[in-house]
Amino acid sequence: MMGLGNGRRSMKSPPLVLAALVACIIVLGFNYWIASSRSVDLQTRIMELEGRVRRAAAERGAVELKKNEFQGELEKQREQLDKIQSSHNFQLESVNKLYQDEKAVLVNNITTGERLIRVLQDQLKTLQRNYGRLQQDVLQFQKNQTNLERKFSYDLSQCINQMKEVKEQCEERIEEVTKKGNEAVASRDLSENNDQRQQLQALSEPQPRLQAAGLPHTEVPQGKGNVLGNSKSQTPAPSSEVVLDSKRQVEKEETNEIQVVNEEPQRDRLPQEPGREQVVEDRPVGGRGFGGAGELGQTPQVQAALSVSQENPEMEGPERDQLVIPDGQEEEQEAAGEGRNQQKLRGEDDYNMDENEAESETDKQAALAGNDRNIDVFNVEDQKRDTINLLDQREKRNHTL
């Protein structure tokens, strides 16, 4: 039974085997198809790769050619670079030499410049010191100028006061002289009247004798009348002349006293020339007719003026002692003072050479004001000259620096 069953099964198995075989054949065919398709693809790829290799070889040959060309060019460029580098090195060496030379020159210039700077610094310090001294001198000069201006104003006020006093004294003397002249005229009139009376008495005594001799009586009184008329007509004339002479004399004395008062401060300030003093002393003082009396009357007033002028320097001594002037400025101020004194003396000589006419107070004050202005102008000019000289010196020093 068992055998029969297995036989049956073996009778049924071939179709399955066939199916399996067909399936295997199909699978194998599919695999073959796949493999053949892959091989075709691979062949195509191989062909492509071969083409690429050929192309790469061709390109490689071209690249090698280009490489050779580039190497030649590189060698040429290297040679050029070597040449350029050698020329550059030569230029650098030359530039370095020039730089070193210039550096040495600049170092020398710097050293000389430093020396000059030190010298200029020393000069600047000295100039600053000199400038400070000059400023001190300028301040001292200004102080001295202010002191001199104060002193000059004080002298002017004293001169004006002295002139007023002298004028008052002159007016008093004019009044005294006029009174004396009137008294002298009156005394002369009295003496002449007494003389005439004595003559009339002397003539009246021999009158009877003349009548006895038969001389006319009317002639004598006519002569007496003429004499009296002449004496009366002549008596007023001397009085007017005396008054005029006295006025002229007083005016001359006033002018001479003013000259003496003006000369005294100048003598105190600067010594005059000996010839100038002799001219002042030799000038005539008296007037007409009353020369001796004029000189005698003038001496006490001149002495009073001299005493006042001598007292004034004693009062002004401390102020003068306070004025401290350097040596250079003393010489400049002495030169300026000598020029001013010469101009003043010339003005006084011109004033004395003119006719001795009476001047009013306004004229005198105007003359004094003119002198003050002239002196102020001289002071301003001196200051301008000093400043100009200082500026010129500074400019010269700046140019030298």
Swiss-Prot record:
Compositionally biased tracts (Polar residues):
228-238, 298-312
Q: Acidic residues compositional bias: what residue ranges?
A: 350-360
Residues in compartment: Cytoplasmic: 1-12
**What name does this protein carry?**
Golgi membrane protein 1
Lineage, uppermost ranks:
Eukaryota, Metazoa, Chordata, Craniata, Vertebrata
**Where are the annotated coiled coils located?**
40-205
Q: Which residues carry this modification: Phosphoserine?
A: S187, S309
Which of the residues are on side Lumenal? 36-401
Membrane topology classification: Single-pass type II membrane protein
Q: How does it assemble?
A: Interacts with DYM.
Q: What is the induction note for this entry? A: Up-regulated in response to viral infection. Induced by the E1A adenoviral protein.
Question: What is known about the tissue distribution of this protein?
Answer: Widely expressed. Highly expressed in colon, prostate, trachea and stomach. Expressed at lower level in testis, muscle, lymphoid tissues, white blood cells and spleen. Predominantly expressed by cells of the epithelial lineage. Expressed at low level in normal liver. Expression significantly increases in virus (HBV, HCV) infected liver. Expression does not increase in liver disease due to non-viral causes (alcohol-induced liver disease, autoimmune hepatitis). Increased expression in hepatocytes appears to be a general feature of advanced liver disease.
What is known about its processing and modification? Glycosylated.
Tell me, what is an example of a GO biological process annotation in this record?
Answer: nucleus organization
Function as written in the Swiss-Prot or TrEMBL entry: Unknown. Cellular response protein to viral infection.
Cite the InterPro entries for this sequence: GOLM1/CASC4 (IPR026139)
On this chain, the residues bearing N-acetylmethionine are M1
Q: Where in the cell is it found?
A: Golgi apparatus, cis-Golgi network membrane
What ranges does the record list as Basic and acidic residues composition bias? 244-255, 264-285, 381-395
Q: Name the residue ranges with Gly residues bias.
A: 286-295
Family note: Belongs to the GOLM family.
Keywords on record:
Acetylation, Coiled coil, Glycoprotein, Golgi apparatus, Membrane, Phosphoprotein, Signal-anchor, Transmembrane, Transmembrane helix
Residue stretches spanning the membrane: 13-35
Where on this protein are sugars attached?
Answer: N109, N144, N398
Instruction: Identify the gene encoding this protein.
Output: GOLM1
- Predominant place of localization: Golgi
